[in-house]
């Protein structure tokens, strides 16, 4: 989602609260619980979950391994749920031509650096760079080139579904900032 007035443009960045993250967190949680309960059922020699039979599983070594996988999956699921709750990675890119400032704000993990806020001068922006790698793990990222700084990514890798969307976004931003586009 973008918000643009005459001299201010704000691009909102979606963080961890995406449907795919919710799906993976649920799948991981239920899968890990299934593994753990089957492993624990093999220890008790009693089915804790009616549709998951543990009669054929010996506690040593299969039951222990399943409990271990279940606990590991629960930790990973907990991590995913925490990133979703904290909305890590969300924020905005703000371009204020009146003040001449480009600001990046992102939410991070809790702690001293929870809020990430960086500012640059708009006059130092050289261009908008597009990086496109097609293939099995395609990658489409917009970068902003600033004098004396490494390229700064403006978008997530999976944000753009088509090359056309990415080109349109880059063209809008380049037009607003009156800079050139590099890449492709």
UniProtKB/Swiss-Prot annotation:
Keywords: Chloroplast, Membrane, Photosynthesis, Plastid, Thylakoid, Transmembrane, Transmembrane helix
Spans through the membrane: 21-43, 58-80
Role according to the record: Seems to be required for the assembly of the photosystem I complex.
GO cellular component, one term: photosystem I
Disulfide pairings: none
Single biological process term from Gene Ontology: photosynthesis
Full protein name: Photosystem I assembly protein Ycf4
Family of this protein: Belongs to the Ycf4 family.
Principal subcellular localisation of the protein: plastid
HAMAP family, A to Z: Ycf4
Protein localization: Plastid, Chloroplast thylakoid membrane
Membrane topology field: Multi-pass membrane protein
Top-level taxon of origin: Eukaryota
InterPro entries: PSI_Ycf4_assembly
